[in-house]
Swiss-Prot record:
Organism: Shewanella putrefaciens (strain CN-32 / ATCC BAA-453)
Annotated Zn(2+) binding sites: C7, C10, C26, C30
Protein name in UniProt: DNA gyrase inhibitor YacG
Gene that specifies this protein: yacG
Cofactor requirement: Zn(2+)
Lineage of producing organism: Bacteria, Pseudomonadati, Pseudomonadota, Gammaproteobacteria, Alteromonadales
Keyword Metal-binding: yes
Length: 69
C-alpha cells in the first residue's frame, strides 16, 4: 500500500510514489504557488545569528568615539 500525503498547498491527497511527478504537491500549479511563496519570502528558514549582538557592547562598538579617528 503506497503512502499518501496531503498536498501542502491545497491539502489534496497525493500518492507518494515514483510516478507522482509533483510530489509532495498534487499538481504543477501547487508546486509553483509554493515556489512563489519562497521567492517572495513568505516562507523562511529560521537562522541563528553568527554574532551575539549583546556581546558587541562588550567591545564598545556602539560608542561614537570608536568610529572617530
Amino acid at each position: 500500500m503506497p503512502l499518501t500525503v496531503k498536498c501542502p498547498i491545497c491539502k489534496t491527497p497525493v500518492e507518494w510514489a515514483p510516478q507522482s511527478e509533483f510530489k509532495p504537491f498534487c499538481s504543477e500549479r501547487c508546486k509553483l504557488i509554493d515556489l512563489g511563496d519562497w521567492a517572495s519570502e513568505k516562507h523562511a528558514i529560521p537562522v541563528k545569528s553568527e554574532f551575539d549582538l549583546d556581546a558587541l557592547d562588550e567591545f564598545d562598538l556602539d560608542e561614537d568615539a570608536f568610529f572617530k579617528e
